[in-house]
């Protein structure tokens, strides 16, 4: 490890810490390993892949003290833990959105709207809020609070605030459906197997506000669907699980809540036809449609997706009203979705 780099830093906007901004701290940590332009990435080059590059990987802890950090954050160095004072008072926020004009393709597009980008492995956040404040999906389009592209990522007691596409759990699918649909930092990077763990978090949005191809385990989280005055106000998840990947999204002991009228939101729909989303012991509020899940008009998804529930409770939890392609798990089948199995991969990862 570079002797000039401490193992811990404090970040405080009042100048009492080592840095005044998270951007400043990350730029200092990353400057010796990555080109300066990468610290402000719109598009990361295909090579090197920063997630697996060499350089300093000694664990570093950043204490992020209370404040509204109106910064665009890019994390490229592995082994960083960022601990906020409190998610109510420690906020990383931005306001970029997909319909913003851009010279190259005419608009910013989904994947250049992030307030925070993680393109590294072994990153942990605790007690921090990620926010995109740009507006509701029908008005501004997609707007990411967090673009999470890495393996062994942990988020504990965090909030994710936004509207359409609040949280992107990379990787991207192999191919675009629309031209220039993937323009952004991950477009040219190899698609990597990412495992994420979200514990005691609050996530909100309207359309597809948790989406992507990662294997992600959500435990004791609240998933809040926001009212946008539409017949369908919200789709909570839009997984794009790669074909052959054993796990997609697993929600355990989570609460699906919202301020939408009864039966005006869905638990999820398949961004790609091999999507996997499993609910274990979750509370399903009245705002969720009785059928629970939507097929996004993909007939092949009836055969290829996995949408499954075990011991759901709440007003919209009746499995008898779900479509035939939604599975009700037995206790033996539900045991396949314990955290230690879902996240273990080839290295036995099992975050506490």
Annotate the PLM regions.
Residues 2-352:
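Sequence-level preference for short, compositionally simple segments enriched
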